[in-house]
Amino acid sequence: MAWKRELTLAALNASSENTMVAHLGIIYTRLEAGLLEAEMPVDARTHQPFGLLHGGASAALAETLGSMAGWLMTEEGQCVVGTELNATHHRPVSSGKVRGECRPLHLGRQSQSWEIVVYDEKGRRCCTCRLGTAVLG
């Protein structure tokens, strides 16, 4: 699968300046056919009160990846908005960083579905997410 829009990782990361994405420290790290990847630190910004990665931070990473991937699959003048996010948390993470990998499940004219898997630094699956998006425009 080829992306419909051609952007560099630098351009993707620049688009996140002064947003929640930047505040959480999310950085896009890989863009290739059918895969968008990003990393997020596990630190005070993303911890819950017990010192573990907050489930909402994992969800924010997933929605960030799925929404950007969805936009990369639209035509000029179109955008995507999230319609549903499901997250299943498999294991805790207390420090370091996590990596999210986003791949398409369904790419329709009006809707898309994305799977985002979050891994810890040892490559263990920590969270599995599915994001639904609507294509507007």
From Swiss-Prot:
Coiled-coil intervals, chain numbering: none
InterPro entries per record: HotDog_dom_sf, PAAI_dom, Thioesterase_EntH, Thioestr_dom
Catalytic-site annotation from UniProt: E63
Key words of the record: Cytoplasm, Hydrolase
GO terms for biological process, alphabetical: enterobactin biosynthetic process
One GO MF term attached to the UniProt entry: 1,4-dihydroxy-2-naphthoyl-CoA thioesterase activity
Known pathway: Siderophore biosynthesis; enterobactin biosynthesis
Superkingdom to which the source organism belongs: Bacteria
Keyword Hydrolase: yes
Enzyme class: hydrolase
EC number, UniProt record: 3.1.2.-
Membrane-spanning ranges: none
Gene Ontology CC annotation, any one: cytosol
Subcellular location: Cytoplasm
Keyword DNA repair: no
Gene3D superfamilies, per the entry: Hotdog Thioesterase
Family note: Belongs to the thioesterase PaaI family.
Subunit structure: Homotetramer. Dimer of dimers. Interacts specifically with the aryl carrier protein (ArCP) domain of EntB.
Function comment: Required for optimal enterobactin synthesis. Acts as a proofreading enzyme that prevents EntB misacylation by hydrolyzing the thioester bound existing between EntB and wrongly charged molecules.
Name under which the protein is recorded: Proofreading thioesterase EntH
Source organism per UniProt: Klebsiella pneumoniae subsp. pneumoniae (strain ATCC 700721 / MGH 78578)
Gene behind the chain: entH
